[in-house]
Every structure is written in C-alpha cells, then in structure tokens.
C-alpha cells in the first residue's frame, strides 16, 4: 500500500513536468508573476509629481507657499504658467499632473486674517496622484497659515509659547502601524501574492485534470499531496522570501503562516478538482479562471472593504478560499497575529476543502452515471 502510494506521488510529479501547460503555470507563471508583478509598485510612494503654478499674487508669501509645496517629497513645481489656458495645455500634454492657482491679494488677505483660498486641479482618475497633491498643498498651506497667525499674535504682545498653543491647541502624532512608509506596495502586494498562489494552482489543476477521467484509487490523494507540497514551497518563496527581497514589512511567525497556508492550499486544490470536474474542457477552465481573477481580487476585501459589499456578495465570497485566507495571511505576516487570531480562518479553509472534495466526487460520479 505504501509503495503503491509513493508510486502515485511519483506519477503526479511526472505529470506536472510532462504537461506543458501545467509546468508553465505551476512552475513558470508562479515565479514570473510573483517576481515581475511588484516591479511597478516598488517605489512605494509617489515622488516628485510635476505640477504647474499660476502665481497671480507674486508676493513674498505666495513665493514662500510655492517653495513649501515644492519642498514636499511627493510634488515638484516644474512649471510656472501665466494663465489657466497655458497650464491646461501642459496638463493635456501630460507634462504636468496638477495645477495650483494662488489668487491675487493672497498675501494681503492672509496678513489681514481673512481667508485666502487656493485653487488646485489634479487628475482625479489617478487617486494616488490626486491624494499626494492634496496632501502636499494642505500641509504647505497649514504650516504657512500657522506661521502667519503666530506672527500676528506675537506682534500683539502674546508670548510665543502661548501663541503657538492658541494656533495649535492639539498636537496630533500619527504612527502608521504595519506600513511605516504608507506605501502602496506594502498595502497591496501581500494580498496579491496570495491570489497569485490561488490562481496559478487552480489553472495548473485545470490543465492536468479538465476533460480527463479520474484514475481512481490512491491517485487523487497523491495528486492533492503533491500539489499542496509544491505550493507550500511556493508559499515560502512568495510570502516569506520575496517580502524580504522587496523590503516589505513582515513580522509574522513562519509556523503560524504555514498553519493558515496549508489548509488554504488544500482548499484551493479541492476547488481545482471540483472546477475541473464541472467544466469539461481545459480551455473552458482557463477561461473561467481568467475571467474570475479580477472579481476575486475585489472580493478579497483589499481594494473594496468587505463592510461596503452587498450582503449577497459577502456570502458568496465565503465560497472562495482566498476571501478569508488573504486577510488572515496579511494579519499573520504583516501584523504579527497569533494562531488564536486566525483559527476561525483555518476551520473555514478545512470546511471548504471538505465541501469541494465532496463536490468533485459527486461531479465525477454524475459524469460516469450515464455510461453505467
């Protein structure tokens, strides 16, 4: 029995290597996506976004405001425009990504204690660019306004310390936990890595099993063990090694990570068997999984918070292993969660593994029934 089981394991390994589609997906594509997908995001934050300034005041304070905006890491004042039409031309040519307008009498209104509105235009189609420009402008305007107000109070005879307390009665210190740089890569890549594991494993199983009858006996168990073992190695590469290479924050215990990852991979494997039994052709499985890729990303709760999803979608999403595995693995790897914090996810993954295994067996028996 044991010798026969190990022979089946050897057959499963050989099947992966001999099948071009499975080999390219489970070996090549996993490494390719995991290594090359992060490249555009490795700078973490936006730096030196080019903007144009229309200074209609030309005063000392307007120039100081522009200097402070330009001093921000995220923004660089690269152009000075005479009017809005010329700035708009630069914007449409993509030579700049934002326009800042300092109004006339800016300095006079500011020194008189009146509101001095500043107008900013940015590309709302790119939320990162829009947010960094708004942040740079707000910080510069706030610091300059506070400095002018403190100067006005001290000129009226108020002590400097008291004036600063009046201008800023509450000093807030923000500490970005688990993502010190506030970077986009540190936010999105840990979740994407988990989805890469899921999608390539499902596609590999689809290449190997779709349209082919089950060998029966010990073969399905041997196949499942080989797939889970192979992707357990990939989990170490993708969830431990690559975050270290890319300097992504990771403080979790590797043993706890595997306590979640192995049941997750088992559930994905069982799902792959079920999909391969329900969809008769290899091409159909691949098409189904490619179409499903983007919805799975949204259902994972990374870019679309689960609290904002319709209840129907939230319920359906629990049938996908990544829905609960992604936040659990992120909590373990990036936030240092302990085993008790993710034990519910482990039970969900085991339940999904059992449910999809039963579905795969039922689908196989249903397909064989007409020929009996």
Region annotations inferred by a language model:
Residues 1-12, 79, 164, 177, ...:
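Juxtamembrane loop-helix boundary motifs flanking transmembrane segments in multi-pass membrane proteins
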Residues 1-184:
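Extracytoplasmic/periplasmic domains immediately adjacent to an N-terminal transmembrane anchor
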Residues 2, 6-10, 186, 217-225, ...:
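Alpha-helical membrane-protein architecture signal
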Residues 27-31, 192-193, 224, 228, ...:
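Residue-level signature of the transmembrane alpha-helical core
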Residues 33, 37-41, 199-207, 234, ...:
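Structural signal for membrane-spanning alpha-helices in multi-pass inner-membrane proteins
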Residues 35, 175-244:
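Hydrophobic alpha-helical transmembrane segments of multi-pass membrane transport proteins
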Residues 58, 89, 240, 249-372:
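Membrane-spanning alpha-helical segments of multipass transporters and channels
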Residues 100, 135, 203-208, 269, ...:
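Short helix-terminus and kink motifs of transmembrane alpha helices
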